[in-house]
A protein has these predicted regions:
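Conserved N-terminal beta1-alpha1 strand-loop-helix module at the mouth
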Residues: 1-91, 110, 159, 170-171, ...
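Histidine/lysine/aspartate-rich catalytic loop segments that bind and position anionic ligands
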Residues: 94, 98-144
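Catalytic cores of alpha/beta
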Residues: 35, 80-90, 123-131, 168-184
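Long, low-complexity, intrinsically disordered segments
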Residues: 224-228
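Glycine-rich phosphate-binding active-site loops on the catalytic face of alpha/beta enzymes
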Residues: 97-104, 137-146, 180-203
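Conserved functional loop/turn residues at catalytic and ligand-binding sites
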Residues: 43, 67, 91, 99, ...
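Short, ordered loop/turn segments at secondary-structure junctions
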Residues: 51-52, 78, 100-102, 120-121, ...
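Hydrophobic faces of well-ordered beta-strands that scaffold small-molecule active sites
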Residues: 20-24, 47-49, 73-76, 95-96, ...
């Protein structure tokens, strides 16, 4: 199935519309593929395959070829330029990093790919913006107070598009969105390692559906949104 080339603006918009980036960490290629199918079945057409997954580049390449037309496939835990280049060549439509590395942003810029660097403090957020980051991952957000921390960051940075990651779950997802999060990065609370290992994909699909509902509940109905 042909993959539609998306602009950075398209990817940013889709991330915001979906509101959730599932972070897939798996012990094998097979587990990663099963996780993606379970997540998509739950109504979340976007995944972040981390570099900690065995043969992550091959997983990304295969997913892009098989599901890239209807699922946004990204690469996570990208920490250096070499990884970034490999992910782009594999077809990753966005890159996510746990921290801020200028070389990763540079590779993404050359290839016209969205990169979502990690930051935690206001200074790190400002540095990311200065380097051209349009969307920033706030990690590990849970250790800083969760939704309250996002609300605090949005006060001096009202236009920042923030994706809290770490400590995000169905119980606080709506609160994060209400606090001003652009989207949410969700890992173990969605992709349950035991369920994946045991083949209990229904648990992951159900968790995805609950997250989708939680995010939707915190957003105004489409009919209430003002058109620009």
């Amino acid at each position: 199935m042909p993959v539609t080339e998306l602009s950075i603006e398209d990817v940013i918009r889709r991330v915001g519309e979906i509101g959730i980036i599932p972070v897939v960490r798996a012990a094998s290629v097979e587990e990663a593929n099963r996780a993606v199918e379970a997540i998509c079945a739950g109504g979340i057409p976007i995944v972040e395959i981390t570099m900690t997954v065995p043969n992550a580049i091959s997983v990304i390449r295969e997913l892009v070829q098989r599901r890239g037309a209807d699922v946004l496939i990204g690469a996570g835990t990208v920490t250096n330029a070499e990884q970034a280049e490999s992910c782009v060549r594999a077809g990753a439509q966005f890159l996510v990093s746990p921290g801020l590395t200028a070389s990763v942003l540079s590779v993404a810029r050359v290839h016209d790919r969205l990169v979502i660097p990690g930051a935690l403090t206001p200074t790190e957020l400002m540095n990311a913006q200065e380097l051209g980051a349009r969307v920033v991952k706030i990690f590990p957000c849970g250790s800083m107070g969760g939704p309250k921390y996002i609300k605090s960051l949005k006060a001096p940075f009202p236009h920042a598009q923030l994706i809290p990651t770490g400590g995000v779950n169905a119980g606080n997802a709506a609160e994060f969105i209400a606090a001003g999060a652009y989207a949410l990065g969700v890992g173990a609370d969605l992709v349950d390692a035991a369920a994946l290992r045991e083949g209990n994909l229904g648990k992951i699909t159900s968790a995805a559906k609950v997250l989708v509902q939680a995010v939707a509940s915190a957003r105004p109905a489409k009919s209430d949104k003002k058109t620009n």
